From Swiss-Prot:
One of its GO terms (biological process) is glycolytic process. Gene3D superfamilies: Phosphoglycerate mutase-like. Signal peptide: none annotated. The gene is gpmA. The record marks 182 as: Transition state stabilizer. This is 2,3-bisphosphoglycerate-dependent phosphoglycerate mutase. Keywords: Gluconeogenesis, Glycolysis, Isomerase. SUPFAM superfamilies: Phosphoglycerate mutase-like. It holds the Pfam family His_Phos_1. The active site is at residues 9, 87.
Amino acid sequence: MIKLVLLRHGESQWNRENRFTGWYDIDLTDQGREEAANAGKLLREGGFVFDVAYTSVLKRAIRTLWSVLDAMDLMWIPVFKSWRLNERHYGALQGLNKSETSQKYGEEQVLVWRRSYDTPPPALEKSDERYPGSEPRYADLAEEEIPLSECLKDTVDRFLPIWHETIAPEIRKGRKVIIAAHGNSLRALVKYLDNISEEDIVGVNIPTGIPLVYELDDDLNALRSYYLGDQEALKKAVDAVASQGKASQ
């Protein structure tokens, strides 16, 4: 039986401030660093080892992976970074407070932007200072690959090529893999692995800093999945993610 570990980065500063983060390169909070270290401890105590790791090009995911590998004494394994594992791009919402945005546009509209499958938020203009095309880390991308806004469908379409062409072949070779990424890029993979419908993916929330273990058969079909750690704390963390888009009372 094959085990694949998925890990959303620890709490970032904009998670704490309840902002749409997207491709903005915000760092972890102290709590986020603690979550990452604890994830590494849980994995070590659970007897997990890894041969190769994958992450995005955003520091909150990279630093989370560093902390995990440090806690497991695995900092020597190969780490591959790709923009394809980045968070979903939130377009013109990036940097805005989620509760304030809900007050302005309504909770239902913000839920659609946050969690629907095929409705992207309002797009950025290329002249906007938040447009990622001017950043050196994306210099090798074609202009059409750099998003102005993304829905989850766009994120799935961005993520699956690296899964099929790079990650899945490594797993089939017998390599033990961890993917440290973001809430929506991981939701994209979870949707694929569990064959979740476009309607049901709306209700899937992935908490920060808690390892999600997938057990796969030889054809990489999902047999079951589960989170490591305290289940009561897990429920609170999932509920907290679900409530982020609600208007402040």
